[in-house]
Amino acid sequence: MSKAHKPWPYRRRSQFSSRKYLKKEMNSFQQQPPPFGTVPPQMMFPPNWQGAEKDAAFLAKDFNFLTLNNQPPPGNRSQPRAMGPENNLYSQYEQKVRPCIDLIDSLRALGVEQDLALPAIAVIGDQSSGKSSVLEALSGVALPRGSGIVTRCPLVLKLKKQPCEAWAGRISYRNTELELQDPGQVEKEIHKAQNVMAGNGRGISHELISLEITSPEVPDLTIIDLPGITRVAVDNQPRDIGLQIKALIKKYIQRQQTINLVVVPCNVDIATTEALSMAHEVDPEGDRTIGILTKPDLMDRGTEKSVMNVVRNLTYPLKKGYMIVKCRGQQEITNRLSLAEATKKEITFFQTHPYFRVLLEEGSATVPRLAERLTTELIMHIQKSLPLLEGQIRESHQKATEELRRCGADIPSQEADKMFFLIEKIKMFNQDIEKLVEGEEVVRENETRLYNKIREDFKNWVGILATNTQKVKNIIHEEVEKYEKQYRGKELLGFVNYKTFEIIVHQYIQQLVEPALSMLQKAMEIIQQAFINVAKKHFGEFFNLNQTVQSTIEDIKVKHTAKAENMIQLQFRMEQMVFCQDQIYSVVLKKVREEIFNPLGTPSQNMKLNSHFPSNESSVSSFTEIGIHLNAYFLETSKRLANQIPFIIQYFMLRENGDSLQKAMMQILQEKNRYSWLLQEQSETATKRRILKERIYRLTQARHALCQFSSKEIH
């Protein structure tokens, strides 16, 4: 028989038998004799699990009395019993199993599920699929029943087995917590809780109701019951109630930490079941889905083999397989058949059924066996999820702590404390401004330091100067021809009129003023934005203080931009005075001459002058000479301006601007009567800080719980 067509119990055994850690933990129990109980002998341990091939995934045969026996222990349950073999075995069971479930329940009680997903079992099913009956059989209490949507809020059902204690219950929702003394109170209190959470109509809510039951007759298990899937809105239900319910169900079942328990009646076509379809959508491989078949007594005669194929995992394969149960029917509920009697009738039904009794022997049938299976699945799932959960809690804690740090500390209530608080805020702001000015600010991976942003504009400025020099070279012949025709006086042929040289220099120096002022404007905007970003970082949560600082930044920017602009204008006015030190100019002039003329003394192609030469020889001589001088002078002028203009911008817009801003910030401290106004915090910031503190508290408690659990496991 191929692996794909093996009966499910055999596939299950081979799948789980490799889990050495569970087998190791259970070894201490497997050698003890089975306790006396009311469970039929064939249910104490399925024949095909005997010997060395026993299924390590289940809790060993000696645990069966803990989960399968729904009869109350002999004697008064409220009185402690002597520590016999049964109690000793339960004590060992308690040490291994209960802490796992208690750990997750405690994390859920802390509200950790608001921050990350916890291991859980979620029960889903279509309306009238028998979902409520299964949960009633597991919990031993009556849950809300009726037509339409009965479960209107997610219900966390925490079952705790305590052999020596009387029944006790507790229901919690929102700010309400109520102790229950009798199982009969459960249905009424759940109805009341749902009306509080979802209103008195037929709407639904995503808020959780927690129901904790402690009893000797329940398994150790925590299950989340979700609303039944509906397709048509009735009465006063919202028109999109079906979509709302599906969205709520999907919110839970899509989590990788959730085992999906899909309840399907035997008398429907499994391929058309909405619940199984939703589970398949979020778990295509069936790794975390268990199918539960209900109502085997209502199926049509002749369809038994098809149900057998489903349970044996041959029709719609799931890696965790299927189980089949028979719960109380409506008539039995009306006749007040107890859950204990219902369990006996269920066992008798499967024992005497010609087709299904083999499923009983294989451990795939009855509610008690389902309880054992679910407890084991949940424990395995918790143990598997703990390393990932620990990492997620640590990461979420770090992230929340960092967010809280960015929100800043709480604002003091005392005026004296407010002064120190404001001093510290301004001190940190000034330090960051100083780092910007010095080019030492801390940047993230994809960010750029302020100096590098400005430097890009400075590089463009060098390009502008080079372009301007080239323009001079290109128009020399036009200027010389104009001189020859209009302005030449008594000077001899070949002599250059110095006035012509000055006119050309003045003309092209003036063309550089606008690009220089444009560069100043761009640099100013970059620097101002950097200062504003620092202000938002430190004062963003204080609207009045942030506005005050940004207004100060704007005022100082205007002041120093005007100073820088005046200095640039002054620089260019000075450049109108044609000047260069003789020793510097002579060196540059010599270098240009060497580049212009080759050793034979003929014009070189480097200046590309040939195409611009006038026809007469005097023009050639004048053109070449003035070209050499202009080229030499503009080379030296470009060097001077390439550094001088950036110097002016850096000095006024960074150094002076930053210093003035830091001094102005200290002036704010003199206005003591404005402290409270300046430190008025935005309401969303206070809310965010409170939420983050609550999250950090939850996650801290969760880490503490995990550490305690780990230390107990080690010891």
Swiss-Prot record:
GO molecular function, a single term: GTP binding
Alphabetized InterPro entries for the sequence: Dynamin (IPR022812), Dynamin_GTPase (IPR001401), Dynamin_GTPase_CS (IPR019762), Dynamin_N (IPR045063), Dynamin_stalk (IPR000375), G_DYNAMIN_dom (IPR030381), GED (IPR003130), GED_dom (IPR020850)
Subcellular location: Cytoplasm; Nucleus; Nucleus, Nuclear pore complex
Domain Dynamin-type G: 115-387
Entry's induction text: By type I and type III interferons.
UniProt keyword Protein transport, yes or no: yes
Residues covered by the GED domain: 623-714
Pfam families named in the record: Dynamin_M, Dynamin_N, GED
A single Gene Ontology CC term: cytoplasm
Region spans: G4 motif: 294-297
Free-text function comment from the UniProt entry: Interferon-induced dynamin-like GTPase with potent antiviral activity against human immunodeficiency virus type 1 (HIV-1). Acts by targeting the viral capsid and affects the nuclear uptake and/or stability of the HIV-1 replication complex and the subsequent chromosomal integration of the proviral DNA. Exhibits antiviral activity also against simian immunodeficiency virus (SIV-mnd). May play a role in regulating nucleocytoplasmic transport and cell-cycle progression.
PANTHER family: DYNAMIN, INTERFERON-INDUCED GTP-BINDING PROTEIN MX2
Name of this protein: Interferon-induced GTP-binding protein Mx2
Source taxonomy: Eukaryota, Metazoa, Chordata, Craniata, Vertebrata
Gene that this polypeptide is encoded by: MX2
